[in-house]
Every structure is written in C-alpha cells, then in structure tokens.
A protein has these predicted regions:
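Phosphate/dinucleotide-binding and metal-coordinating scaffold of catalytic cores
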Residues: 1-311, 315-322
C-alpha cells in the first residue's frame, strides 16, 4: 500500500506516552526489512532517565535493531496497537473503495494499518511519519447515529461520504471483528460496539447482560451502558486504558496475552490457560489475586457460553518493568 503522497510506507516512528505523561515522545523506529518489520530504539530515547521498554521480554531497552522472536514478522507488542479485523475492513474501504464481496480478498500492509488508523488506539503507543512532530489523527465528534450509519455502509461494502469516512477513522485502530468506534464524553472514554448485519439476535445486548452479570458476581470488568441508535442496540464500554487527571488524559500501556505467549494469530492455537497462569506466577505484581481472577473468568465464560475467549482478548497493564 502507499502513503497519502503515493510512495510506499517503508518505516514508522513509534511514539509512546510514558507513565504519568500527557504528551508522547519518540521511542524508536519500525522499519521494513525484507518481509518483516524490525524495531530499534532511538538514541535520544535511550538517553532519557525515564525511558521504559515498550515490553521488555520482547523489546528490551538497548541500542541497535532488535531481533524478532521466532515465527513473528513484526514485534507482537507493536501489533497489539494495530487495527484488527473491523478496523482493517474500514481502512480497506477507505483506501481501496472495496465492495462487500471483495473484502475478504483485499489486504493492506502492516505499516499502512499503523500509519493510517486513528491515533487514540488501545494502550500507550501511536505511529507517525515524523520523528519530530506529533500530529494526532483525530476526528470531529459524530453522533452515535452517524457512526452506526457509517459502520453499516462499511459492512455492506458501500462507499462513504467524506464526513462519514472521517467519522469512522477514530475507531480504525481498535481490535476485534465486530463493528465498533471510539467515543469521548467529558472525563470518560468509551468503545461503542454495534450490532452486525448478520446477527440473528442482539449480540451487543447479550454482551451487556454478560458483563453486568460478571460485575454482580465480583469479576473486575469495565462499566457498561446500553443505548439505542436508529432503533438498534449500542453497547458502550468504558475504557480502562485512559485516565483523566488534572485536566489531561493519561494513557496506560498494555500488552495482550498473545504477546505474552510470544505468538501471533497464526500460532494462537498453541495458547493455553495453563501457560497464561505460568506467566502470571512469574511476571505479575500480584500473581495470587490475578490467578484467582483468571480462574473466576474461566468459570464464568463456561457458564455463560462465551466462545470468543482467545488470547488477544486477554491483556495486562505494563508499567515498563512488570
């Protein structure tokens, strides 16, 4: 794929929000090397007294190009910040003007997904073409009705007006396969999940009920709200990777369980609860409480019939050390 100026992307500067910071700094460079993407930290970043590793088990804080883990084509902790199925579909629609039936056959390269998606992505990273100037890719604040209309058009493979196209940009960096966008309401930020056109029942309402039940039985889950837009259910999930403090937003770094497993999507079948429990015992700040939470979630998922409990759907905060 190509940049806005027509030339292929060959690199992306990785910007990071350090713990407690309200503005990002450049951490390093992600560059194309053959069929893979390699990362190296910048000298100025390594010289900072407050520098932290993006994720030390994979990208330790040291100079030079960092070798990829076996089987990976890019650092998994950076892939965590990239769009997933829905965000990629929106970007394909945006860049190529695909039709509905063409969507599964079309793909963009990873640098395009990183550099053309919205900046308010999960975790504490973003990606820019510049090493000196940070320009966030944000949008105006559309209504839920406008966002739902745009999402439905993408699902049907229909072209978007410039206004609707811009409205969906904000949610392109999100993971997951279902239609979703990002919303901000004062001192809270939300992920809004929409019904899909092929749903046989209100899946988002079922998810709302499941999350409320999880909260009732003592699991640590995000606050959720159910709203209506154009007569359809919309699930609002409060974001836990953003903290509003002293008039500013702070970002919390996160890594997925897939990254902790040192796997990618092609190898996700090798992930297991047993391996995750072992990682928790050795690396987490409070392993006993975390293991109890993990076991409780496993039991709850079985009881409520959740079959979407894959490794990308588990994540942990990263403070630069643990």
């Amino acid at each position: 794929m190509t940049s806005e100026k027509g030339a292929p992307y060959s690199e992306a500067y990785v910007w990071i929000w350090l713990p407690g910071a309200t503005q990002p700094v450049v951490a390093g460079l992600l560059s194309q090397q053959g069929g893979a993407l390699a990362f190296n930290y910048g000298r100025s970043y390594l010289a900072r007294p407050d520098a932290i590793a993006i994720y030390a088990p994979e990208l330790p804080l040291r100079p030079g190009a960092l070798a990829l883990l076996p089987g990976l084509s890019m650092p998994s902790c950076i892939r965590d910040a990239s769009p997933d199925a829905w965000g990629r579909r929106v970007l394909i629609n945006r860049k190529l003007g695909m039709t509905g039936g063409d969507a599964p056959q079309l793909e963009l390269d990873e640098l395009t997904y990183l550099l053309d998606s919205g900046s308010d992505r999960i975790g504490a990273l973003d990606f820019q073409q510049s090493a000196t100037q940070y320009v966030p890719r944000h949008t105006q604040k559309p209504t839920l009705e406008e966002l739902l209309t745009a999402a439905e058009k993408v699902e049907r493979g229909m072209p978007l007006s410039p206004e609707l196209d811009q409205a969906l940009l904000h949610g392109t960096s999100l993971g997951g396969a279902r239609p979703k966008v990002l919303l901000e309401d004062g001192e809270r930020k939300f992920i809004a999940k929409f019904s899909a056109s092929h749903d046989l029942y209100s899946v988002v309402k079922a998810e709302f009920i499941a999350m409320r039940l999880a909260d009732e039985v003592g699991l640590d889950v995000a606050p959720v709200h159910l709203r209506k837009a154009l007569g359809k259910d919309v699930l609002l999930i409060e974001r836990f990777d953003r903290v509003w403090s002293d008039g500013h937003w702070h970002r919390r770094a996160m890594v997925s369980a897939l990254t902790m497993f040192e796997l990618d999507e092609m190898m996700a079948a090798y992930a297991s609860y047993e391996k995750l429990a072992e990682i928790i015992r050795h690396r987490f700040v409070n392993p006993k409480a975390t293991l109890r939470e993990l076991f409780s979630r496993i039991v709850f998922n079985i009881l409520c019939g959740n079959t979407d409990d894959h490794a990308r759907n588990h994540a942990a905060f990263w403070d630069g050390h643990q």
